[in-house]
A protein has these predicted regions:
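Alpha-helical transmembrane segments and their immediate juxtamembrane cytosolic regions
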Residues: 1-242
């Protein structure tokens, strides 16, 4: 497993910096989706400006998922323990599901699963393609079938971003050896969301370095997703819009 990270003079972003930006973008997106769309708008008591605010929040929030997909590919390429990485993703997918349903659907909802499931399936699809290769280094039939099974699972589970999310992850993985091609592929495969291709303007400045972060912050990045949607669920369902 290898990738191509270019050393860029001047301005650059570490992996930690990209994670922080993605967290901020995701938070703004979910404020719009939970507090406004699943809260205020359902009450019918809102001003036209609230709709415009929601639009701005959701547009800024479109930057988060492509960045997380890129970081997932980087994580896959550099992990020393794939099994532990995958189990961590599964654990947080399970932890996040009820807060996800509560924040965005006000109760248990089986028709849409949280983004950790999407990332987990993307991780498994990359593993299949990496494990089963032809002598020329191309994906072998077993690898393709394994990736196809992940696409089927994403469709059946109705994961966040669905099969398009998986396609974006694999596009970034397949172009990992050429940063220019990777950013172009990422922009093209994220066209299903407005503004999302702009995320690769940030990815372009990725330094290839993990960046300074404590062990606590590294775990905080994982916990941020279930924690913030739980808080939004409390605000939307118990505090602001009872």
């Amino acid at each position: 497993m290898q990738n191509n990270t270019l050393s860029r003079p001047g301005f650059s972003l570490s992996g930690t910096a990209l994670k922080r930006l993605a967290c901020l973008s995701m938070l703004l997106d979910h404020i719009g989706a939970s507090l406004l769309e699943n809260g205020l708008f359902k009450q019918g008591a809102f001003w036209p400006g609230d709709v415009q605010l929601d639009g701005v929040l959701r547009l800024v929030g479109r930057l988060a998922f492509p960045i997380y997909c890129f970081l997932l590919v980087e994580g896959f390429l550099h992990t020393h323990d794939f099994k532990k990485y995958a189990l961590r993703m599964l654990g947080f997918a399970l932890i996040s599901e009820w807060p996800f349903d509560w924040a965005f659907f006000s109760g248990v909802y089986w028709g849409h699963q949280n983004v950790y499931f999407t990332l987990l399936l993307g991780l498994l699809a990359m593993k299949a393609l990496d494990t089963y290769q032809t002598p020329e280094g191309m994906p072998a039939l077993k690898g393709i079938l394994g990736a196809a099974a992940c696409f089927l699972a994403a469709a059946l589970l109705h994961c966040d971003y669905d099969v398009l999310g998986l396609a974006l992850i694999l596009a970034l993985y397949m172009t990992r050896k050429d940063k220019r091609a990777q950013c172009i592929a990422g922009a093209v495969f994220s066209l299903f969301e407005p503004v999302a291709p702009l995320a690769f303007g940030l990815v372009w400045f990725y330094s290839g370095e993990r960046g300074g972060s404590s062990k606590l912050e590294q775990w905080a990045f994982y916990w941020f997703y279930p924690a913030h949607i739980f808080v939004l669920g409390v605000l939307a369902n118990l505090v602001l819009f009872r």
